């Protein structure tokens, strides 16, 4: 009987872990983010802003796992954001809620190198915990840039946004 109880206890723990894992969003990798960003740049170079409709398709190739494409002009105006369309048209260059001026840093990178990684903190999906995230951005032939962000694997949680001074 004691052995049966132990086996049932282990099975219950394993089941619980699987249930919690099933609730967690599937996360994209940095390599997947870079590949998606490169594909987005190619599409924008071919179609211009008409590519935004393709980026908005939740069942398409530009929204996989937690990855999606966003686009911004060189002044900081959000041009396309499939997950938060209310941001489109807003100038976010001075956004600094988490202390890292991520959009200003993206613009500076697009102006100087044309492409690369920008690191920042962002709330992890379903929580208020800040985690390390990186976006791979590429300035396209049309004069703006697009990017795709991925959470850094195994990065520790930082403080909650309310804790930031």
Feature locations, PLM:
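N-terminal membrane-sensor/transducer module of prokaryotic signaling receptors
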Residues: 2-165
């Amino acid at each position: 009987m004691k052995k049966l109880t132990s086996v049932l206890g282990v099975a219950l723990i394993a089941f619980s872990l699987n249930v919690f894992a099933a609730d967690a969003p599937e996360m994209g990798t940095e390599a997947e983010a870079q590949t998606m960003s490169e594909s987005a740049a190619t599409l924008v170079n071919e179609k211009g802003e008409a590519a935004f409709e393709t980026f908005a398709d939740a069942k398409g190739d530009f929204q996989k796992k937690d990855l999606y494409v966003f686009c911004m002009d060189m002044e900081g105006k959000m041009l396309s954001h499939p997950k938060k369309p209310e941001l489109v048209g807003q100038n976010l260059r001075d956004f600094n809620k988490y202390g890292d001026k991520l959009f200003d840093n993206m613009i500076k990178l697009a102006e100087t190198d044309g492409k690369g990684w920008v690191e920042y903190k962002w709330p992890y999906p379903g929580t208020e915990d800040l985690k390390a995230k990186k976006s791979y951005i590429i300035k396209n032939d049309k004069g703006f840039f697009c990017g795709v962000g991925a959470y850094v694997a195994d990065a520790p949680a930082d403080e909650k946004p309310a804790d930031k001074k």
